Amino acid sequence: MSMSDPIADFLTRIRNANMAQHESVEAPASKMKKDIAEILKNEGFIRDVEYVDDNKQGIIRVFLKYGNDGQRVISGLKRISKPGLRTYVKSDAVPKVLNGLGIAIISTSEGVVTDKVARAKKIGGEVIAYVW
């Protein structure tokens, strides 16, 4: 059976593993998922990301990050643009998540970027998710 929204599945796997205090989580790989994982790593929400080639689609392994006292770094993940209701923003309407404390992940003509990069480059696109 095919999955209707693989990005939502990826974000849900991260959210559930994070809530259960797991060390890492695996998901089927895709270019979009790799880009999202790299953004989460660069923004400090996850510790590391690893790609495993299994002679098929590949697997993306995300290593979650926690504070010294076990406090979760990712307090929330929300899918915004869904297959049934795509959400696009113009360059002058790029959202701020929690007044800049979180990030919006946006798919633009220049690749998958954060809201800060989209605002700096003055480009809009499809709002994939909010992370805070």
Curated annotation (Swiss-Prot):
List UniProt keywords, sorted A-Z.
Answer: Ribonucleoprotein, Ribosomal protein, RNA-binding, rRNA-binding
**Gene Ontology terms describing biological process:** translation
Highest taxon of the source?
Bacteria
This entry carries the following GO cellular component terms, namely: ribonucleoprotein complex; ribosome
What cystine pairs are annotated? Answer: none
Question: Any stretches that span the bilayer, and where are they?
Answer: none
Q: Which PANTHER family match?
A: 40S RIBOSOMAL PROTEIN S15A
Assembly, per entry: Part of the 30S ribosomal subunit. Contacts proteins S5 and S12.
The entry sums up its family as follows:
Belongs to the universal ribosomal protein uS8 family.
Q: By its UniProt entry, which NCBIfam families does this protein fall under?
A: PRK00136.1
Record's protein name: Small ribosomal subunit protein uS8
